[in-house]
Amino acid sequence: MIYSKRLILVVGPTGTKKSYLANMLAKKLNVPIISADAYQVYKELNAGVNKPSEKTLSEIKYHFISNISIFDEWSIAHFNKRAKEILEQAPDWTIVCGGSHLYVNSLINDYQLEKQELDTDLFDALDKLDNQEIFNQLCEYDFQEAIKIGKNNRKRLLRALYLFKKYGKKAKNDSKKFDYVVVKCMSDKEKLFPYLSKRLDEMIHDLNWTKEIEYLDKIITDKKLDKELIAMKALGYKEIYDAWKNNQPIDKEIINKKFKRLVKHQLTWTRNKFNDGMKQFTFNFFEDDANRTCDEIIEYIKSNHD
């Protein structure tokens, strides 16, 4: 099936102001935003996941922000199915914004996750790998998704890697299912890393991250559930939790190192993927004017796809 709806993908590493640009573009075009973020969907997570503000949510129609509890199941298949249902009712253009690239990839390449026939040769070959080997390979495709799943959840690791190996690169005669314009939000690491370090300080001190961790610990304990919930694997949450539980100072250097590792993977992914859309734009928050970038995108859309 080829869909008539068109997408504006706003992708890039964490900290490159994807949401800032997407929000501005959504207001100018009066279109909704589908959040392709692995953690913003959980209503209990706030301080560490950079959700849109209440003011922004009152001005822009967002999907997959605070939709479910950390105790609910959420996966690529859930996102894929729900996003397609939303797009059936959406206007001609919809923005998809987020750093969980497997989510974005599953949508534009129309993964049929519920109906797929198993490629037994590929699955059997991957099943011979140990958990660390599967984890390492998945990191090359989507570092954030690999971290979210964790090294010990073999079933989910294997499924995610299988999806990438099977569907991540389309066959030469396969056509994309959604037409899309892509905006790649990029920045030099030399400018991005200091910014991320400063943002981490703000998340810890201004947004009461530790207080949120204390609340999460209480509700998880009350339900007598394992602390190893998928939602709690969002970047920084384990480190903040361990520091709080052991009454120790937060080791910001460890969290910063994980941010840097994530960014390096996301930079490589963003450069190499989403290159077969109708038009590609780039946005560097440190150098480019967001208004001008939005106007260029809108001019292209109006002049080519009325």
Curated annotation (Swiss-Prot):
Gene3D superfamilies, alphabetized:
1.10.20.140, P-loop containing nucleotide triphosphate hydrolases
SUPFAM superfamilies per UniProt:
P-loop containing nucleoside triphosphate hydrolases
Q: Which UniProt keywords apply?
A: ATP-binding, Magnesium, Nucleotide-binding, Transferase, tRNA processing
Mention one GO molecular function: ATP binding
The broad enzyme category this protein falls into is transferase
Entry binding sites for ATP: 12-19
The superkingdom listed in its UniProt entry is Bacteria
Q: Which reaction(s) are listed as its catalytic activity?
A: adenosine(37) in tRNA + dimethylallyl diphosphate = N(6)-dimethylallyladenosine(37) in tRNA + diphosphate
The record's annotation in InterPro entries points to:
Dimethylallyltransferase (IPR039657), Guanylate_kin-like_dom (IPR008144), IPT (IPR018022), P-loop_NTPase (IPR027417)
Recorded hits in Pfam families, A to Z, give: IPPT
Biological process terms in GO annotation: tRNA modification
| Marked site (Interaction with substrate tRNA) residue numbers | 100
Cofactor(s) for this UniProt protein: Mg(2+)
tRNA processing found in the keyword field: yes
Q: What is its EC number?
A: 2.5.1.75
Say what the protein does: Catalyzes the transfer of a dimethylallyl group onto the adenine at position 37 in tRNAs that read codons beginning with uridine, leading to the formation of N6-(dimethylallyl)adenosine (i(6)A).
Q: Quaternary state and partners of this protein?
A: Monomer.
- Which family does the record assign? Belongs to the IPP transferase family.
Task: Name it.
Answer: tRNA dimethylallyltransferase
